[in-house]
From Swiss-Prot:
Organism expressing this protein natively: Drosophila miranda
Family to which this protein belongs: Belongs to the type-B carboxylesterase/lipase family.
Disulfide pattern: C87-C106, C262-C274, C518-C539
Positions glycosylated per UniProt: N95, N116, N479, N510
Pfam families membership: COesterase
Residue stretches spanning the membrane: none
Keyword match Glycoprotein: yes
UniProtKB keywords: Disulfide bond, Glycoprotein, Hydrolase, Secreted, Serine esterase, Signal
GO cellular component terms, A-Z: extracellular region
Keyword Secreted part of the UniProt annotation: yes
Entries under InterPro entries matching the protein: AB_hydrolase_fold, CarbesteraseB, Carboxylesterase_B_AS, Carboxylesterase_B_CS
Protein name: Esterase-5A
Amino acid sequence: MHLVRWLICLIQLWIQLGAAGSVTLLDPLLIEIPNGKLRGRDNGHYYSYEAIPYAEPPTGELRFEVPKPYKQQWTNTFDATQPPVLCMQWNQFINGTNKLLGVEDCLTVSVYRPKNSSRNNFPVVANLHGGAFMFGGPSQYGHENIMREGSVILVTIGYRLGPLGFVSTGDADLSGNFGLKDQRLALLWIKQNIASFGGEPENILVVGHSAGGASVHLQMLREDFSKVAKAAISFSGNALDPWVIQQGLRGRTFELGRIVGCGQASDSVTLKKCLKSKPASEIVSAVQSFLVFSYVPFTPFGPAIESPDAPEAFITQHPIDIIKSGKFAQVPWAVTYTTEDGGYNAALLLEKQASSGRELILDLNDRWFDWAPYLLFYRDSMTTIKDMDDYSRKLRQEYLGDRRFSVESYWDVQRMFTDLLFKNSVTVSVDLHRKYGKSPVYAFVYDNPAEVGVGQILSGRNDVYFGTVHGDDVFLIFNVSFVPANRRPDEQIISRNFIKMLEYFALSTNDTMAYGDCVFQNNVGSKHMQLLSITRDGCENKQLNCFIQRCLIFF
């Protein structure tokens, strides 16, 4: 009799925890979703369920097409214990001449759930990885830091990159933005399935860094984004950055065809058919033909404005026009930058060349007018060579005056890169959203240099001060392999505050956002633009204004 009562209580407990697909105490590693059952891994303080397909493989006839939802039914339990593969890419961080990595069949999500006996369900953070739309992957931004805090479920997403994800002829036949469409389908998958993992589908926060941050903003510019997410954060990247929306992409796409043996194609239909017949490795390896030097320009293939008659077009207007129309998702959004974000792009100029021992920055004295349009992404936006040269001349005068390019003037070059590639667009996007949007818009700037950052890594220099460069903030949230894991005490505090900020934003019932003891100021309806300044000493709300090329903070 006692045994029967015990079994009844156990069954009732199982039902309360969510028998219909939710994580249960009976076997938290075994999850059931519409495709069948999958088994994850116990990692000590968290569970992982990795490389779960959300789309049919984008290969063969599905290459350069809108992704199709994954429909296969598993007869056996799916093994979700293997890490996700990289989408095929030409990766700038690989040493040597062959930088090809990854595979074409890569459209998966990975779910990481903390062990936490005090709660059964968790808010969800969905992360879109960065990498200039050209490289990177879901494992690039590690999950250990977030799992250690034990307060949110993390979902990472693989999406098509480079030419496989972003070729476009600008018409309906080869419209482009396949990587963005992958992201969109993955977010729908999360919304529909995350409850089975113990996630709260009503509390999904979408975040991204660099190209991932720009992707978040682009996703948000679709009105239906509010159906898949509650809020969003763009770290050091937004849709208005000059490297995001590609101009001249039609010409590069046909040039790509010529390089891989499709030079006979004179229209989009013929080109697309030919490209589908070529090995993916040849298409991706052709990226190197579009680089002027090193990894410049770092985004030869990226998001494009599509033709209105394109099938399932992602965006058909420039982001500025979309924001001004007010027809975008009205969800709370935060956009950020670091004080020296441009160090990621400028640091390569300090690398000493193997052949001469000279820094590349010295060559700018003779090649500024040739290289600047590619370094700062205005090559395709200028009507004439004269316009381009005039702008290049103006930039040099504004930031360097009459000084020469040298190691001594590097700091001002880096400041130029920060302003033009990251900082100015934050001010413009916040201003536009506060004028034409209804939901809260927040901003913050991070100023606390890491001991080792991408500046030192990309330049190979430890004798130069780079300041707070690209990633110094977000790498305190997501651990990365190329940055030392040991952190200063102040960074450990900031890391916990950042992760708590994500949880708070995902759970907020009144759309507010906070970091530590500081509450972000909503810019919608405010007289002045506000941003939160975060340093090793704490946080403080400040006023933000912008004059021509430079954004100044008034205390």
